[in-house]
């Protein structure tokens, strides 16, 4: 159980807040604060899992990004070439006129895959990055 409550302020784009409020209503949260605490706990759990994985894995890196952001498409291509030893293939999907989804199949040492995840996550224009570990190599 958490100790005490600390009040913080967060700036969000209106469309992101509207979508969050819609989800809060659908899921039955009593407040934004409760939903934000839940989202932060989920993020921390996923981060800890990513940090704890070791050894060789096979998985898919799912990247959602806004292709209108200058340089993001080129950066993703450059990173795929820079990490060619762990990337077996990739698929590019046009979701709408603004957003693209890149599915990158990875196979290799988790430590190296984490570096790729961090570089993609930090890129301006990238909206979401998710690593799904399909198989742990033996």
Swiss-Prot record:
Record GO terms (molecular function): DNA binding; DNA-binding transcription factor activity; nickel cation binding
A Pfam family the protein falls into: RHH_1
Family: Belongs to the transcriptional regulatory CopG/NikR family.
Biological process, per Gene Ontology: response to nickel cation
Keywords attached to this entry: DNA-binding, Metal-binding, Nickel, Transcription, Transcription regulation
Domain of life the protein comes from: Archaea
Quaternary organization: Homotetramer.
Binding site for Ni(2+): 81, 92, 94, 100
Organism listed in the record: Archaeoglobus fulgidus (strain ATCC 49558 / DSM 4304 / JCM 9628 / NBRC 100126 / VC-16)
Cofactor note: Binds 1 nickel ion per subunit.
Listed cofactors: Ni(2+)
Protein name from the UniProt record: Putative nickel-responsive regulator
Entry function: Transcriptional regulator.
Keyword Transport annotated: no
């Amino acid at each position: 159980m958490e100790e005490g409550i600390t009040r913080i302020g967060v700036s969000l784009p209106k469309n992101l807040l509207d979508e969050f409020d819609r989800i809060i209503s659908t899921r039955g949260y009593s407040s934004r604060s409760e939903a934000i605490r839940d989202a932060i706990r989920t993020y921390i759990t996923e981060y800890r899992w990513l940090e704890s994985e070791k050894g060789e894995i096979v998985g898919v890196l799912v990247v959602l990004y806004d292709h209108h952001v200058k340089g993001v498409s080129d950066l993703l291509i450059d990173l795929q070439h820079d990490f060619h030893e762990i990337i077996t293939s990739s698929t590019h999907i046009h979701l709408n006129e603004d957003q693209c989804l890149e599915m990158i199949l990875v196979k290799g040492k988790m430590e190296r895959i984490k570096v790729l995840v961090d570089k993609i996550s930090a890129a301006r224009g990238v909206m979401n990055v998710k690593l799904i570990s399909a198989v742990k190599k033996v």
